[in-house]
Amino acid sequence: NTFINLTEDLSGGVKLELYDPFLPSSCIIDRFPVKDVNIPTNEFMVKILDAIDAYLEVGHVPYIHCWGGIGRTGTAVGCWLIRHGHATPATVIDLLDELRLGDIEAGYRPSPETPYQLEFILDWELGK
């Protein structure tokens, strides 16, 4: 019932059809625009992770997405997993791969998408 939208520009994302009008009014869309195939600053990632944690704390189910669900999404989810001790820098990529097995269209593609995104996740720390 909560969308964490990491796309830029349009509320539904560039080249992504607007979904806002089709959602029930009870849904929340929280935007944290990150340029495609890029990484946020550490401070901006902390804001993204804090929002995810705040929604989880009140019982919401956050759906984190970017345009393809691989680069920016994988970066945010990877950092969240490390933040909470569900993974370490040594195990996070294997866990992301495992979590993406159900993605029929893109599950075969590595996440995150770029070397910069991978380095960003691997530098993330527990509790950050």
What is each PLM-predicted segment?
Residues 1-62, 84-115:
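Cysteine-based protein phosphatase catalytic domain of the PTP/DSP
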Residues 7, 77, 125:
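Short, flexible helix/strand-to-coil boundary loops that buttress conserved ligand/catalytic motifs
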Residues 59-78:
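A phosphate-binding catalytic loop at a beta-strand-loop-alpha-helix junction
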Residues 78, 94, 122-123:
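Generic alpha-helical structural context detector
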Residues 78-84:
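Walker A/P-loop NTP-binding motif
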Residues 119-128:
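C-terminal domain-closing interface element
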